[in-house]
């Protein structure tokens, strides 16, 4: 169920889509996520970017309509959402032109861990992104990072959370290598984020504020490979962690084999709760973050626009 509060009139075009989506419950709260970001950002004399997912052109347009400052998208290959519709090359050009016409930004994911068979094909795609005018390439693999530097030296690089950026020295190293932005690991605390900002003040920092969590550090899980032969680091994760499991611990001589139960007779050891940081957005911004990211390129338009509006 979508829950939000809007100050706009029903006839206001900027909220027209809201009232075409049901069910809708209006509640009494001070402001939406977008308004909260801008209000806090204004007090700090800086604009904090709201970065939204877009799995296709329709999702891109509605994300911008609902207040996103930038969108991240994937091409037909080389990204971690292989099961999404994504953007064909011609659609990427259309998407970039559309976003730029509205004064917004668009980042393209190149965040697979590349194998040898892909290295020869990446340069052409990278050059195309630079030619089209993409605002950045999101990269996780060190080899792909170097390819972007060589074949599109003016294309900004954002280092993906898949690179497991958990400390200030890693962030500084990426910055020294030429990265414009580093996307921190989801497992970071506010204190750690503040330390990174203090130690590396001259690089953009991006964090996830909403969406799915991985049971392991991003990219370090092999459940999908093991159970379904689908590589999570190549965009086809089966999300096996969300299956129902009965976990049994063995090897305890005093107790023997026994079920592992957390609550209500179930265990959630393989499935982290989804991330929702709305109550901490002000603290995240105060920690020095430049961009707040919503996960969900494969989610529905309804889900994505709800998360940007709540």
Q: Could you describe each region identified by the protein language model?
A:
Residues 22-43:
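Short, Lys/Arg-enriched N-terminal segments with co-localized hydrophobic residues
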Residues 41-165, 184, 192-291, 298-310:
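Active-site pocket-lining/capping segments in soluble small-molecule metabolic enzymes
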């Amino acid at each position: 169920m979508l829950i939000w509060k809007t100050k706009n009139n029903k006839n206001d075009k900027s909220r027209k889509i809201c009232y075409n989506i049901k069910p809708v419950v209006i509640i009494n709260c001070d402001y939406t996520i977008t308004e909260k970001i801008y209000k806090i950002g204004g007090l700090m004399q800086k604009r904090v970017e709201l970065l939204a997912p877009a799995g296709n052109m329709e999702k891109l347009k509605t994300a911008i309509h609902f207040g996103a400052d930038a969108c991240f998208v994937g091409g037909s290959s080389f990204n971690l959402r292989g099961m999404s519709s994504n953007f064909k090359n011609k659609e990427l050009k259309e998407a970039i032109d559309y976003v730029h016409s509205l004064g917004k930004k668009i980042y393209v994911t190149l965040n697979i861990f590349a194998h040898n068979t892909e290295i020869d094909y990446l340069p052409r795609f990278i050059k195309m992104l630079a030619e089209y005018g993409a605002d950045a390439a999101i990269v996780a693999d060190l080899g792909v990072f170097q390819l972007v530097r060589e074949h599109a030296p003016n294309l900004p690089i954002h280092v993906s959370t898949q690179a497991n950026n958990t400390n200030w020295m890693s962030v500084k190293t990426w910055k020294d290598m030429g990265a414009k932005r580093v996307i921190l690991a989801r497992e970071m605390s506010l204190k750690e984020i503040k330390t990174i900002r203090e130690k590396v003040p001259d690089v953009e920092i991006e964090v996830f504020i909403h969406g799915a969590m991985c049971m392991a550090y991003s990219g370090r899980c092999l459940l999908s490979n093991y159970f379904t032969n689908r590589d999570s680091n190549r965009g086809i994760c089966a999300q096996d962690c969300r299956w129902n499991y009965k976990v049994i611990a063995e090897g305890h001589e005093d107790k023997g084999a026994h079920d592992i139960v957390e609550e209500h007779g179930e265990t959630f050891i393989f499935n982290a709760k989804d991330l929702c940081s709305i109550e901490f957005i002000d603290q995240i911004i105060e920690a020095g973050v430049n961009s707040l990211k919503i996960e969900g390129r494969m989610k529905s338009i309804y889900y994505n626009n709800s998360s940007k509006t709540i």
